[in-house]
């Protein structure tokens, strides 16, 4: 599509609908996975390990996801990711066996990698660069809305059918997501061969290693910044409830604080994307991280529910205005040929950060204090802001002109 003919309304249902439903499905089952493991007799440490298999499945599946997307096309990779997740939910909900349950958790992580990479690659291909940040921010926003709605729908189903009801909601949402995604035009039908690029007069088959070598500067600079961003974002989700527990707040109060912060986070995605498209990526990326960092540094200074709410809202505001920034920067710098390989490596770095962030918080909390660990996470946000402020290309002042094809 050209900028003159492109409209968000044209792609809203088929592009964002699957993401909304995928988020709803995952939001429905993620809170009950630990409860299911405990009901099956798993100890608390084993339950934590089983939940961690979801993140591990995503981490280890980013490269295979890129290969699947390159081979079968974005549309069918999105469909496969949704259906694979539905199957995984069935294993978790009705197996009755911890080994099969563990496999289901790992498969959920696999499906996240496949679905997320393929949808990002698809929209990078079809959306004009002038609208890219708005679309990527909306993509991230619809996923967050789905994740927000999911637990409420699951709660009603659990009331009627027990824990299995949540998995039923998740499976229905994922199947609907796959059906809707199947209506997307198939990019593999286009004339461009994304598996090869021409060097001189000879085509060269692209591999993960060749893509890594060709884009190593991007991964070492912007990629490192994205790793830090991912670590901060994941750790903030743990830091707020842990500090609430440190303040001895009631669980219901903690839930309200977290819910209000999530609402702020969820509502800011489109304005942020518009600013990125019109003024440049740096105008959103840097303020997002600075605000998150300030909120995290303030968090250990809070002493009651009111001050904790203010800090949590600041953190959520910073994260909310940065909705879609990781996907946008990845899309901006992904090459036309081998795009799925590039995005697989990009997501791999983000998942490494997501895995390491909470581990660092845990280590600092154990060796120093919880407040020190949270403050270190805030400092990491400022470090990421500086890294990205320096390395986001100045030519990218508007609408991602730094993209290379």
Regions picked out by a protein language model, each given a short descriptive name:
Residues 26, 107-119, 314-326:
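Core transmembrane helices of Major Facilitator Superfamily
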Residues 73, 94-96, 280, 302-303:
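Helix-breaking motifs and short loop linkers at transmembrane-helix boundaries and internal kinks
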């Amino acid at each position: 599509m050209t900028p003159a003919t492109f409209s968000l309304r044209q792609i809203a249902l088929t592009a964002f609908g699957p993401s909304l439903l995928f988020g709803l499905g995952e939001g429905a089952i993620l809170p009950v996975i630990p409860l299911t493991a405990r009901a099956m007799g798993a100890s608390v440490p084993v339950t934590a390990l089983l939940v961690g298999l979801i993140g591990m499945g995503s981490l280890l599946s980013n490269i295979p996801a890129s290969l699947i997307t390159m081979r079968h096309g974005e549309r069918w990779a999105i469909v496969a990711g949704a259906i694979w997740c539905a199957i995984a939910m069935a294993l978790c909900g009705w197996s009755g066996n911890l080994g099969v349950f563990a496999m289901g958790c790992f498969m959920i992580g696999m499906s996240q990698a496949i679905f997320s990479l393929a949808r990002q690659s698809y929209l990078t291909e079809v959306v004009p660069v002038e609208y890219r940040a708005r679309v990527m921010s909306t993509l991230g926003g619809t996923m967050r809305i789905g994740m927000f709605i999911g637990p409420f729908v699951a709660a009603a189903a659990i009331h009627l059918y027990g824990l299995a009801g949540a998995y039923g909601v998740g499976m229905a949402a994922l199947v609907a997501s796959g059906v809707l995604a199947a209506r997307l035009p198939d990019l593999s039908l286009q004339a461009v061969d994304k598996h090869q690029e021409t060097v001189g007069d000879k085509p060269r088959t692209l591999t993960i290693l060749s893509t890594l070598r060709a884009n190593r500067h991007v991964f070492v600079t912007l990629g490192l910044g994205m790793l830090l961003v991912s670590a901060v974002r994941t750790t903030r989700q743990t830091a707020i409830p842990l500090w609430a527990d440190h303040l001895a707040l009631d669980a219901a109060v903690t839930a309200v604080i977290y819910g209000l912060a999530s609402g702020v986070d969820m509502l800011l995605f489109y304005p942020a994307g518009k600013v990125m498209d019109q003024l440049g990526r740096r105008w959103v990326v840097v303020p997002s991280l600075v605000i998150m960092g300030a909120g995290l540094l303030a968090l250990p200074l809070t002493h009651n529910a009111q001050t904790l709410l203010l800090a949590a809202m600041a953190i959520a505001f910073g994260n909310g205005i940065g909705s879609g920034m990781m996907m946008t920067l990845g899309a901006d710098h992904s090459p036309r040929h081998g795009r799925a390989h590039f995005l697989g490596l990009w997501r791999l770095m983000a998942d490494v950060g997501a895995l390491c962030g909470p581990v660092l918080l845990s280590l600092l909390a154990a060796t120093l204090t919880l407040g020190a660990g949270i403050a270190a996470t805030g400092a990491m946000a400022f470090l990421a802001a500086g890294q990205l402020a320096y390395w986001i290309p100045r030519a990218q002042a508007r609408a991602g002109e730094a993209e290379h094809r």
